[in-house]
Design a protein with these regions (language model features):
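Active-site-adjacent loops and short helices of periplasmic peptidoglycan-processing enzymes
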Residues: 38, 70, 75-76, 93-95
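Short, well-ordered beta-strand elements
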Residues: 27-30, 300-317
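Short, conserved catalytic-motif segment at the N-terminal edge
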Residues: 1-50, 70-71
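Short, gly/Ser/Thr-rich active-site loops of penicillin-recognizing serine hydrolases
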Residues: 318-335
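Short, surface-exposed loop or secondary-structure junction motifs
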Residues: 88-292
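Short, surface-exposed charged micro-motifs
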Residues: 16, 278-280, 299-301
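Alpha-helical scaffold elements that line and support the substrate/ligand-binding pocket
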Residues: 20-23, 49-72, 76, 80, ...
Length: 335
């Protein structure tokens, strides 16, 4: 607890943290006063937006489909997407220098422009009262406003666009809404009954979430459609720990799919030391930390050398959580 309290970023209204390891399975949380009408004081079961931590779950869903033989990672993505989606972006080589594969959607090597950097997205986030809603197709149209960053497979740049396409691919292959595919392929097998896609009909009744701050502005009321398969899930620290236990314990994917997911390459600039498929890795003095963080404050990491899991969130968006994660891992190593 002392380590976590000493590493929380100044200005954070609350931090929710869960730590599990073989010798110390524990959940810890702390709360500060908050005045947003929809906010709640955190406890270990409080839900929060996990933002890009969603990418781990989207990638796992796609990999589960590869295990079922419905697609292969090196298939052209366009082969498993509706024509109206393919026509929106340079996926099949007709409008660009190369063909984007499913693998490249998940490892940020597609070269596709990132819709999440579009001014319209951030206007919607900062002025949530406007209630602008985005369909996945709207998000792709925003991405199409910019040129590709590089030919597919020749570079690496973080882009949520690949994961929105992955979500559409999942829907096309399963003939089901994304939230149902998540539930069938990942959430139910992992025992995650407190996780849902916020923009879907899967939202539990009477569930409230932690408030989120962005540059001093309360953005709790922003519309949840701004990211979808790249960052639209809501979860709890306990559910994220269940996901990591199921994923790393071999209950969600075959060994072959797990090896593909953890085939590490240098990470996108400014994000991770290494990146696989929807999965990042930090190299630390206490050993590697494998997982993902999200822009609104969420984090979910596994320390394989310690068999420890660290999950949770802080209320402030776009803050660096790596020092907190490294401090916790170092404390567990020395315990």
């Amino acid at each position: 607890t002392a380590t976590a309290e000493g590493r929380v970023v100044p200005g954070v209204r609350h931090c929710l943290l869960r730590i599990e390891d073989p010798t110390w399975p524990a959940g810890w949380s702390t709360a500060a006063a908050t005045h947003h009408r929809n906010a709640v004081r955190p406890d270990p079961d409080t839900a929060f937006r996990i933002a890009s931590v969603t990418k781990m779950i989207t990638a796992t869903t796609v990999l589960a489909l590869t295990d079922q033989g419905r697609c292969r990672l090196d298939d052209p993505a366009a082969a498993h997407l509706p024509a109206d989606v393919v026509d929106r972006l340079p996926l099949d080589g007709r409008a660009g220098p190369g063909t984007v594969t499913i693998r490249q959607l998940l490892d940020h090597t597609s070269g596709l422009p990132d819709f999440f950097s579009h001014p319209a997205i951030w206007a919607a986030i900062r002025h949530g009262g406007g209630r602008r809603r985005f369909t996945p197709h709207d998000l792709l149209d925003l991405a199409a406003d910019a040129a590709p960053s590089f030919p597919p497979g020749t570079g690496r740049a973080y882009t949520d666009t690949g994961f929105v396409l992955a979500g559409l691919l999942v829907e096309h292959l399963t003939r089901a809404p994304l939230h149902e595919a998540y539930r069938t392929l990942v959430l139910d097998p992992a025992g995650m009954d407190a996780t849902w896609l916020e923009s879907s009909a899967d939202v539990p009744r009477r569930r409230r979430m932690l408030a989120h701050d962005l540059d001093g502005r309360d953005i709790t009321d922003m519309d949840p459609t701004v990211d979808w398969a790249g960052g639209g899930l809501v979860s709890t620290a306990a559910d994220l720990a269940r996901f990591l236990r199921a994923l790393t314990g071999g209950r969600l994917l075959s060994r072959e799919a797990w090896r593909a997911m953890t085939r590490w390459r240098p990470g996108p600039a400014g994000y991770y030391d290494d990146y696989g498929l929807g999965l990042g890795r930090y190299r630390t003095a206490a050993g590697p930390l494998v997982g993902h963080h999200g822009v609104w404050g969420a984090f979910a990491f596994w320390a394989p050398g310690l068999d420890a899991i660290i999950t949770g969130t802080v209320s402030r968006a776009r803050v660096d959580r790596r020092p907190l994660l490294e401090a916790i891992a170092a404390t567990l190593l020395s315990a």
